[in-house]
Amino acid sequence: MAVGVFALLSLPVERYPDVQMGEVLITTMYPGASPKDVESLVTQEIENALDDLESVEYIRSSSYRGRSSIIVKFIDDSDYQKLFSELRLKVLGNMNELPEMIDPPEFDNISVSLWLPTVMVNLIGERSNSALNLMAEEMKIQLRSIPGVKEVTLSGDYTREFHVILDPSRMDELGVTFDETVKALNAANIVYPAGDALNETGEFVIVVDERFRTRQDIAEVVIRKDSDGSFVRVEDVLSRANLNYRDPFIITSVNGMNCVSLKIIKNKSGNILDIVPNVLEVVDHFQDKLAKEGVQVVLTQDQRVYVDESITTLGNNLLVGIILVSLIIWSFMGFRNAVLAMVGIPFSFLLTMIFMWATGNSLNEISLFAFVLVSGIIVDDAIVVVENIYRHLQEGESLQEAVVNGTSEVTFPVIAATSTTVAAFLPMLIMTGSTGEFFAQIPIAITAAIAASLFECLIILPLHFQDWPGKKQVLRTVRYKYTAGTERPLMAWVRRGTNRIVAKTLRFRWTTLFLVFFLFFVSLGIMFVSFTGKFPLIRVEFYPADYTYYYIELEGPVGTALETTSEKLKEVSSFLLPNRPDELQSITAMAGFFLTKDYRPVFGSNVGHLLVELPQKGDRNFTRIENNDPSEHLNNVLKKIDTFVNDDWSVRVRP
């Protein structure tokens, strides 16, 4: 039990298992290039480099202004890590075929944590993104030092760079091409090691650093030396040069205001229940300083809330189950038998925690769902064993004889019953790919819990039964009225009722069979007409009955500027935001991409999405909505948006 408690406290806690999706996202930035140039010079070259990569199911690519996006999907159950390394080597080995001006490609191994971070820390305010970025960078340093944090990524920041604008007429006049200028600038803006040197104090490394530091450094770069000895420099074809920001491909806002977001991703052993409070401590440390600058911190996508809710559900379910089963067993077999049967529930769960911890699994919504599902099953075996031992005691056997005979008599039936339950869930392990890995914790947790309960009821429970009340206690047997033996009145009443029902069933067996088949086909008919919508006897809901966030996807005409999409998202955010926080918690807007239902990214300057977070169930107070039904709230949102968005924009809403 002590080891089980230690394992429970040591288990990583997360919302969902951090499953590898078997996909790699390759992002390559090519500043200033048109979508057509990106397609021909970057995307196609990278695809060609991956032609002979094995175990690839498909490659899906998109080219945008200044950016190439390629998703490579591997065949299910491949060695994803090995394939990821091979893919990376192939792309980097083909860099000579790519334009010199591109940024090094970024490789993201897509997993659940990439799209569902532990928590998002958003800095919002009427300040420039550069100012917000400086504050976020300072906070990022402390957030990265939190135990259990794998990485902290910054989004919404603008990359600062020096823009050189050339004069086309001067270039024609001097016979200078754009490529010549680019090559000259790249050749001059370098840093490279020049060897080692020794002196009296020791050895040091010599580095030649010729990177640009001033505008004049750029202007003096030689593009070409003519035959007469004259030089053509950048300043000869320069129109203007100034510090600026690279055009973003995603613009983020929260509650209709500019923001810079810090995405916090936990490592495999991290515990959400520990990480989020530590994040709040860091935020509180910066709160006063940020408030003076007019900056507000808003936390979104806090996964701890959902984990807490799942743990509360499991705890309530276990508590109610223990109380009800205890009362039932107490009524039929007495207090001692009830306690002995109930001991199996915590024992089985703690033994399961040891197994989960030893095999590298985690506590999450999937495993917690499995525990809730199995919580009513694990006590069944203990009830059978306790009842049979109790029956042998009633028949006059000694305590030791009753324990031995009662347990051995039901050992094989209990094992057979347990095996059939396990066999019903084990086929889930046959599922392949990321889906199979995602749901694998259900059969693993259920099988471990049932196996633990089997061990407890056949080994531990008989020992407890023998030790309590002890060998010297003389069991009393009382003959109750209306019973045929020494059993309790409630048991006798149930037995008589059962005998009558069974007798009538056997007497009218054909009628019974007809009723069984009739009810079976009636239930099938009800299910069919309800699902088809012809006669909905059972209400079929498109959305889940309860949820705490939903997505609103916007798509504008092709060619819409990213800034226009961002402004449209801000307008919708401001339009939906209520005056009361008990109606809506936050709205996070991201212009430039949205996620499909299966979490596949779709990029484009004309698309974007809103992530709307609702208050928790107990904190909601929707205006003029009965029972604070989120489905009714969503219907109202749809009506509002339909009247707000014009015909040029399409809108989709989904939980």
Regions found by a protein language model. Give the residues of each.
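Hydrophobic transmembrane alpha-helices and their membrane-interface caps
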Residues: F6-R15, I323-S331, F335-R391
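Membrane-proximal juxtamembrane linkers immediately C-terminal to transmembrane helices
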Residues: V13-Y30, S63, I110-L116, K534-V558, ...
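Membrane-water interface of transmembrane alpha-helices in multipass transporters/channels
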Residues: R15-Q20, G334-G344, T359-V374, I430-T447, ...
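Surface-exposed amphipathic alpha-helical segments in non-transmembrane regions
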Residues: M1-F6, S10, L41-Y58, K73-R160, ...
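Juxtamembrane "pre-transmembrane" interface segments
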Residues: T153-D157, I165, D236-L238, S253-L327, ...
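Transmembrane alpha-helices and their membrane-interface boundaries in multi-pass membrane transporters
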Residues: S375-I389, T411-I430, E437-A484, L610
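Signature of alpha-helical transmembrane segments and their immediate interfacial
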Residues: M1-V13, V410, K481-R539
